[in-house]
Amino acid sequence: MTKLPAHVAVTGRVKDWLKDPESRLPVSCTVFHVKDSMEGKDGIEDSWIFTSRALRNAAGVAIDLSDLRPSGTSNGKGLVASGPCSFAAVYSGLNELLRRGGAFRNGAITLYLNYDHPDIEQYLDLSLDIIPWAKRAVYVDENLMQSPHIDKIVKRVRDGSIWLAKKSYDRQGRRLYSNVCMEILLLSRGTCLLSHGNLGSVTVSEIPQMFEKGMQFLCELHSKTGVGDSGIYLTPEEDRQVGFGVIGLSNLLALEHVKYADFVDALEKVLGYGKETPSEPAYAIACALLEGYSRAAIVARAHNMERAFTIAPTATCSYKYRDRDGYTTAPEISPVNCHPI
C-alpha cells in the first residue's frame, strides 16, 4: 500500500481508496470527446455509457460535443442530424439521477462546444430548464474576437451561464480537453488524480521536501489505482498525468506575518522580473516554493509524467485539514473577479 507522507492533503476519493482499494476509483474527473456517430466506439451512445459509469464512480465528467454535425444536416443516407444541443439534456439527466448513491458520490457534468460550431448560438441560448444539472463551457482560440457571436458569448460569460476554455494541444499535437473545473487538461478518456500539499501545516524550510514527497506519493499512486482496468478510461501507460496542488497558502502567510502583496513582490523577484525589494520572510517563502516546485518537477519527469501540477485545489479537501495553529486551511486566495471582458 502506498504510504501517505506528512503534510499531504488527499482528496476524499483518494482517502477512501487508500482505506479500501476495492470500493471505487480514486480519480476526480474525466473527459470524453464525442465522435459524430450514434453507435460505435466514442460515439454518442458510448458517451452515455461512459458518463454513467464515471458518475457512479464519483467522477466529474466533461463532454465535448464539438464534432457533432449541426442540426438539420443530412448525412447523405437519408438521416438528418438533430445537433449537439439536442443531446445536452441527456447528460444533465444522467447527472441528476446518478450523482448520488451509497457512499459519497456527488458528480458533475460540464458540456463543451467550440465557439465556431454552427450551432453555437442555440447552445448559448439553452435554458437551465432544459439542462439544470449541467454546466456549459465554450472552447475558444485566438480568433474568438472575430466571431459573429462574440457579443452574445460575452453576455453569457458575464451572467455566469457560460465558461470559457482555450483549445489546447500537447507536444505531440494531440488535442487536450478541459475537465469539469477547467484546471486540468486531459486526453479523451483520461483521468485526473489529485492531491495537495498543506502549506499551512509546514514551516517555510519544510516546503521543498513536502513538494518532493507529495509528488512522489502521487506518481507512485498513479500506477496502482486500477483505472486502466475499468474498461472505460485510458491506462496509466497512456495517460501520463497527475495533479499536485497546494492548500493553505493564506494560512502560511498569516502564520509568517507576510502580506499577500509582499509575497507577490517576492515571487516576482525570485522569478526574475520583479522590481520591488521584498521583505525577508516573503522572500524566504517565495524561494522555498520555487525550490519545491522544481524538486517536484524532477520527480514527475523521472516518472515520465507529461503534466503534473494543478493551480486550483479541491476546495472541499482544504476544509478537512488544519494549519499549525489549528485553524481550518483555506483552499486558495481568490481575489474578486472584476476583470473587464
What is each stretch, according to the model?
Residues 1-341:
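Extended catalytic cores of very large enzyme megasubunits
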